[in-house]
């Protein structure tokens, strides 16, 4: 892309600016010095006196308007009028316009020939016919002589000659008058048939159609090299045109006034051209009038011929598609003009010549309505003129002028055909010329003119029609992409349900086969020295994976559909249920959509894409081998050079001022998809004016970005009781998160485990379970990068789990549960409960009659009651001997997922009955509290029966059915402690049975702080508001019972963040997305880059696992994570994302050269106006990356080897500076300067229409940004807790 060099020159003076605008007007104005114009004004004054003076003045203003519009078109577009008409109209329309322009030039030349012949007759007494021949000969002399001159010299000669002639003509008339009579006895009060002929003559004498094309041509030539802005150039042209045509108008007024005084006042009638010349002698008051008359006509004739020789070329080329020499063109026009003049002289003499001159002016006036239609349409077209199109006042004047021309022509034609006026009868029964040629010619010309008027009025410009069609097509395409039909969704849903069972059966069989044939080996689990590295991010996928990612990204617009009809997944929520009345029960039959994303994202089905799966599996194998060889410290930042097709040969990193493909790393399709993704996400929050949409306001999202942000953040530090009332349950250890992130903690956790120890509470080997849910849950936690399942637990961190534990030498598989969404969950849970009950009954542990007496209770409730019965009967064994208990405080989490491996003793079971009595209040997640134990126990090593049995080698453990009986005592007092030692610690130390069964080495530096933070089932907005042990035992089908005022903000924030995760996932699938998330040019931008790096790590891990065990139908997107008080996953993250979006879109706009993408960026920037206020209007403290954004060093991929043997480009360090309003203002100025230099190819639709329109739209939104940002003096607090200037937990780690 070529960049234009703009030279700044000193401001030009008035004369220097006016000369380029004055030269075209001089060449055009000479065409008005001809006998035809004089005769028309003399005839009007002689017949109607002063009545037509005002009308003549209006005609002069119309001429100024038309000539100014013609010049404005050329100045603004850089193209002349004929060229634009050729682009905007079809072939036949252009041909008619070209014939009309040539006919106008012939009529003008005819009057010149007749005038020169009369002048020769007066001076030398030659015959008129001889004078016509002599006048015709000069047409061959001057153009031939001019052809030997250079074009520049010929233009100079003609321009100076035109100026001299015009000056002598106007000054001679005005200075010869002792006083200019200004008396007007009256004005025309009605438009009658008698005055129609004279008015048509005056109109033709005031405006010449083909002068539009000449003026447009020379205006573009004279101002093409000017550095003055277009608005100033247009004003200069208007001033020059007004001055010159005002002088011509004064001359016409003098002639009309003299004719009124001489002829109209005395009752005489002008019959011949000699009578008109006698009046000219009185006007000039000099006996030298014949000589001056001859000189004026001769020079004006030559100048007009030379001007048309240059300007008429464009008419021949663009309209008629004819290529002939200029001299031949001029000779043809002169021959066609001489023929009717000779005929008139031979048949009618001097009287016929006078009538012929008036007749020519009437014919010219009949062509005016056809000529001004394309002129005014082009000038008022925004697609062509852009911001420089004529204003509404100009459009009104143009429309009024056209209607005036058309009305006068209609009145003339009607009077000529049906009228009884003198001139109409004289035309019909003309005896002067002996025939009715004049009448026939006028009638045919009028009919042709009216037909062409109708044709042009019904034919729109191509640019306008193409743009309308493009807008309709784009709207239909966007609707088709954004809103899939109900039929498609139903078909997809039906196929998913039909194939669900088959997929599960295949999955179980494959997993079973793999587990049977896979040998379990030990793996080293080592934590990185620095968990959060500033310059370490995930590298791009290997070629095989990139091929699969491209498959995703190219089809994501059509394949990432929203399953909004499948039970409208809501964020899991559980609240403290005290005694509530029926009026507090709120039945939510359908959750209103806040964002287009649902927890289940539908990605293109890969069942038929076996080749992509095979390639991806091969890529995983290759990656495993490569990872063993690569150094773990050689990491690659996200800010790479993009895909190979966009990398330069220089190998320089960063973002310079090179080409767009080199800088951005995004192809055209990727940039288009990027703008579509951002517009989709922000479209559910803001409209095109930056205002919250009604749906978002109804969900109280304005409170998240407004004054309620502080309350939302402060709410996290309140006590447990206050958090319960607000619908948010605070982790007890969140306050101590910074202390937990010290190096001593990681030093203690980094140690190797002994062979006899167990990796972590989630380190269970995957067993063969008959339940499909267990296999499905196995997929959620496994993010290994191996292909043989023997190193699957080499990951140092589970998805959104902040536990750091030593590695396992026993290679146990992960069994971490995850939040599972979907309509099939209820059936899965019921099947599990049913199988569990049947197993208990078959073993004789529960009487069958007792189980059957439960009536209509669900299997889940029956299982819970059965567990309660076993606990009350004393079946729960005591603690297992030989295991040291770990007495650390834990976060408040869901009761069903707490430390079920801690083998408790029998205790109080009163809360179990209360739990069964209560009912489950939400429908998005079934109750699996009674199944967690069994589901996990079934997968212990060497477990044959699915339970912990001493005889099966399970470590001497018995069934742990009584854990629910004592959980109320364990967690009853946890609500009042935030960041302090737990009461549970004392209980655990005094009662060994309450300790976890699996011990972890505890560092002395950790104190009583917990190594645990929220797990995926404890994520923010999912299950944060637990308060009762029996909450999870309530029926899933019962209605929700929550406090809307307390939980609406939390729910809205959770859904918004979940939608944000979907958006990030779509962005990282774009080819070349490494550039997007690799700039790190601000604190907000760096935070979003880290979020994207974490999401990409998780996505790639899921993709590898799914490719190993087979496609499961739909990838599961877990809920929003939360690691404690300092977690970044809150509403402030959306504000940071907005700042990131503004910065990235402006960066793209800085180097963008496609008007199509300018428009898409404009849409996104319009919506992002809503982010300006929350981001820059208040003092904001930047957030610090937390545990949730960490990527284990063992999974930091090695940087690929450079092709030329050189080291890869260094990672761009984070600047640690905040993006302020001043920063964006500077960037906006650069964008404005950049787009102002963009130009399309002249003569194309892109260069003439798309570029001006795109510049206008983008400049408009940038002006709004400048206005709003200039009023935002307050920015982010760079010295706050999240600043680089302060040493925080993140700063010490990164």
From Swiss-Prot:
Changing residue 645 to A: Constitutive of ethylene response in absence of ethylene associated with an increased histone acetylation of H3K14 and H3K23. 85% decreased phosphorylation and constitutive activation of ethylene response. Residues 1-12, 72-105, 149-155, 216-237, 309-334, 377-397, 462-1294 are cytoplasmic. GO terms for molecular function: chromatin binding; histone binding; metal ion transmembrane transporter activity; mRNA binding. GO terms for cellular component: endoplasmic reticulum membrane; nucleus. This is Ethylene-insensitive protein 2. Central factor in signaling pathways regulated by ethylene (ET) and involved in various processes including development, plant defense, senescence, nucleotide sugar flux, and tropisms. Necessary for ethylene-mediated gene regulation, and for the induction of some genes by ozone. Acts downstream of ET receptors, and upstream of ethylene regulated transcription factors. Required for cytokinin-mediated processes. Seems to be implicated in cross-talk between ET, jasmonate and other pathways. Probably not involved in iron uptake. 'Oresara' means 'long living' in Korean. Residues 536-550 have a biased composition (Basic and acidic residues). Pfam families: Nramp. Induction: Accumulates upon hypoxia (e.g. submergences). Expression level is enhanced by a chromatin-dependent epigenetic regulatory mechanism involving both EEN and REF6/EIN6. It comes from Arabidopsis thaliana.
């Amino acid at each position: 892309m070529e960049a234009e060099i703009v030279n700044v020159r000193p401001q030009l003076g008035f004369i220097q600016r006016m000369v380029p605008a004055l030269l075209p007007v001089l060449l055009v104005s000479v065409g008005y010095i001809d006998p035809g114009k004089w005769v028309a004004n003399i005839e009007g004054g002689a017949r109607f006196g002063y009545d037509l003076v005002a009308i003549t003045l209006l005609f002069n203003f119309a001429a100024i308007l038309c000539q100014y519009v013609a010049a404005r078109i050329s100045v603004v577009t850089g193209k002349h009028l004929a060229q634009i008409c050729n682009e905007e109209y079809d072939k036949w329309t252009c041909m008619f316009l070209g014939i009309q322009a040539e006919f106008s030039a012939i009529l003008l030349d005819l009057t010149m020939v007749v005038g020169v012949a009369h002048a020769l007759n007066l001076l030398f007494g030659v015959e008129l016919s001889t004078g016509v021949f002599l006048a015709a000969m000069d047409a061959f002399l001057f153009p031939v002589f001019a052809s030997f001159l250079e074009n520049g010299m010929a233009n100079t000669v003609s321009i100076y000659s035109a100026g001299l002639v015009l000056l002598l003509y106007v000054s001679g008339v005005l200075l010869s008058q002792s006083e200019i009579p200004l008396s007007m006895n009256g004005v025309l009060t009605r438009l009658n048939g008698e005055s129609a002929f004279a008015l048509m003559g005056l109109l033709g004498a005031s405006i010449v159609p083909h002068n539009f094309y000449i003026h447009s041509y020379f205006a573009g030539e004279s101002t093409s090299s000017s550095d003055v802005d277009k608005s100033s150039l247009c004003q200069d042209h208007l001033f020059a045109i007004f001055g010159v045509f005002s002088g011509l108008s004064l001359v016409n007024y003098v002639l009309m006034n003299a004719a009124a005084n001489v002829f109209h006042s005395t009752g005489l009638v002008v019959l011949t051209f000699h009578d008109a010349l006698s009046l000219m002698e009185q006007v000039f008051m000099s006996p030298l009038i014949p000589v001056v008359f001859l000189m004026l006509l001769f020079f004006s004739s030559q100048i007009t011929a030379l001007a048309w020789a240059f300007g008429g070329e464009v008419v021949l080329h663009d309209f008629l598609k004819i290529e002939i020499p200029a001299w031949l063109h001029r000779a043809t026009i002169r021959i066609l003009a001489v023929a009717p003049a000779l005929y008139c002289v031979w048949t009618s003499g001097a009287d016929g010549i006078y009538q012929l001159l008036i007749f020519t002016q009437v014919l010219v006036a009949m062509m005016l309505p056809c000529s001004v239609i394309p002129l005014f349409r082009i000038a008022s077209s925004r697609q062509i003129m852009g911001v420089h199109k004529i204003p509404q006042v100009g459009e009104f004047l143009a429309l009024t002028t056209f209607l005036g021309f058309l009305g006068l022509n209609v009145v003339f034609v009607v009077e000529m055909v049906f009228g009884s006026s003198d001139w109409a009868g004289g035309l019909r029964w003309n005896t002067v010329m002996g025939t009715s040629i004049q009448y026939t010619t006028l009638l045919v010309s009028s009919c042709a003119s009216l037909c062409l008027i109708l044709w042009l009025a019904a034919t729109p410009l191509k640019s306008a029609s193409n743009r309308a069609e493009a807008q309709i097509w784009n709207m239909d395409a966007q609707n088709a992409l954004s809103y899939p039909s109900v039929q498609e969704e139903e078909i997809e849903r039906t196929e998913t349900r039909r194939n669900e069972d088959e997929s599960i059966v295949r999955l179980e069989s494959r997993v079973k086969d793999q587990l049977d044939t896979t040998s379990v080996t030990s793996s080293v689990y080592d934590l990185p020295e620095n968990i959060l590295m500033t310059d370490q991010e995930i590298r791009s996928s290997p070629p095989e994976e990139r091929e699969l990612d491209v498959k995703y990204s190219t089809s994501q617009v059509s394949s990432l559909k929203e399953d909004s009809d499948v039970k409208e997944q809501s964020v899991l929520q559980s609240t403290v249920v005290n005694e509530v009345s029926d009026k507090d029960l709120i039945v939510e039959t359908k959750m209103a959509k806040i964002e287009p994303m649902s927890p289940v994202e539908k990605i293109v089905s890969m069942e038929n894409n076996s080749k992509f799966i095979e390639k991806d599996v091969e890529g995983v194998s290759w990656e495993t081998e490569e990872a063993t060889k690569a150094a773990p410290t050689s990491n690659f930042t996200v800010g790479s050079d993009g895909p190979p097709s966009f990398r330069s040969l220089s190998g320089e990193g960063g973002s310079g001022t090179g080409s767009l493909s080199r800088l951005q790393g995004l192809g055209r399709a990727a940039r288009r998809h990027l703008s579509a993704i951002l517009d989709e996400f922000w479209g559910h929050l803001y409209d095109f004016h930056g205002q919250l949409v009604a749906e978002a306001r109804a969900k109280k999202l304005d409170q998240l970005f407004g004054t309620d942000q502080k309350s939302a953040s402060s709410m996290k530090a309140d006590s447990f009781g206050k958090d319960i009332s607000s619908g948010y349950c605070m982790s007890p250890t969140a306050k101590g998160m910074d202390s937990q992130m010290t190096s001593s903690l990681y030093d203690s956790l980094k140690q190797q485990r002994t062979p006899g120890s167990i990796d972590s509470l989630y380190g269970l080997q995957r067993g063969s379970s008959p339940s499909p849910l267990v296999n499905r849950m196995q997929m959620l936690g496994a993010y290994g990068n191996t292909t043989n399942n023997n190193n699957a637990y080499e990951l140092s961190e589970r998805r959104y789990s902040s536990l750091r534990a030593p590695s396992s030498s026993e290679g146990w598989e992960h069994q971490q549960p995850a939040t599972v969404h979907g309509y099939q969950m209820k059936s899965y849970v019921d099947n599990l409960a049913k199988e569990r009950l049947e197993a208990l009954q078959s073993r004789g542990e529960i009487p069958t009659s007792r189980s059957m007496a439960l009536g209509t209770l669900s299997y889940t409730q029956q299982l819970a009651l059965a567990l309660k019965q076993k606990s009350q009967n004393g079946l729960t064994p005591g603690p297992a001997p030989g295991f040291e208990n770990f007495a650390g405080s834990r976060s408040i989490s869901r009761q069903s997922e707490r430390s079920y491996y801690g083998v408790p003793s029998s205790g109080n079971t009163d809360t179990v009955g209360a739990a069964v009595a209560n009912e489950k209040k939400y429908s998005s997640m079934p109750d699996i509290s009674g199944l967690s134990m069994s589901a996990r126990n079934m997968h212990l090593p060497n477990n044959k029966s699915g339970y912990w049995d001493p005889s099966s080698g399970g470590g001497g453990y018995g069934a742990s059915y009584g854990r629910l009986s004592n959980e109320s005592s364990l967690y009853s007092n946890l609500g009042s402690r935030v960041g302090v030692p737990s009461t549970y610690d004392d209980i655990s130390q005094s009662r060994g049975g309450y300790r976890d069964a699996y011990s972890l080495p505890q560092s002395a530096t950790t104190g009583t702080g917990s190594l645990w933070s929220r797990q995926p089932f404890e994520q923010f907005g999912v299950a944060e508001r637990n308060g009762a042990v029996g909450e999870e035992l309530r029926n899933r089908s019962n209605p929700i019972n929550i406090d809307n005022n307390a939980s609406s903000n939390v729910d809205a924030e959770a859904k918004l963040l979940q939608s944000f995760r979907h958006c990030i996932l779509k962005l990282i699938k774009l080819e070349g997305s490494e550039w997007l998330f690799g700039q790190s040019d601000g604190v907000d931008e760096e935070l979003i880059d880290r979020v994207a790096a974490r999401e990409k790590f998780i996505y790639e891990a899921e993709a590898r696992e799914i490719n190993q065990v087979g496609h499961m139908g739909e990838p599961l997107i877990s809920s929003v994570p939360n690691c404690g008080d300092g977690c970044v996953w809150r509403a402030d993250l959306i504000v940071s994302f907005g700042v990131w979006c503004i910065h990235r879109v402006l960066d793209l706009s800085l180097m963008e050269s496609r008007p199509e993408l300018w428009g898409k960026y404009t849409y996104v920037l319009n919506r992002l106006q809503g982010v300006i206020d929350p981001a820059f209007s208040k003092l904001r403290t930047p957030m610090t990356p937390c545990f949730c954004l960490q990527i284990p060093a063992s999974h930091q991929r090695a940087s690929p080897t450079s092709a030329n043997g050189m080291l890869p480009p260094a990672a761009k360090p984070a600047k640690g500076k905040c993006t302020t309003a001043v920063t964006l203002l500077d960037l906006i100025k650069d964008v404005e300067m950049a787009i102002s230099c963009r130009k399309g190819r002249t003569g194309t639709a892109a260069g003439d229409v798309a570029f001006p329109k795109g510049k206008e739209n983008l400049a408009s939104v940038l002006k709004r940004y400048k206005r709003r940002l200039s009023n935002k003096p307050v920015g982010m607090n760079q010295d706050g807790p999240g600043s680089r200037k302060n040493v925080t937990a993140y700063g010490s780690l990164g």
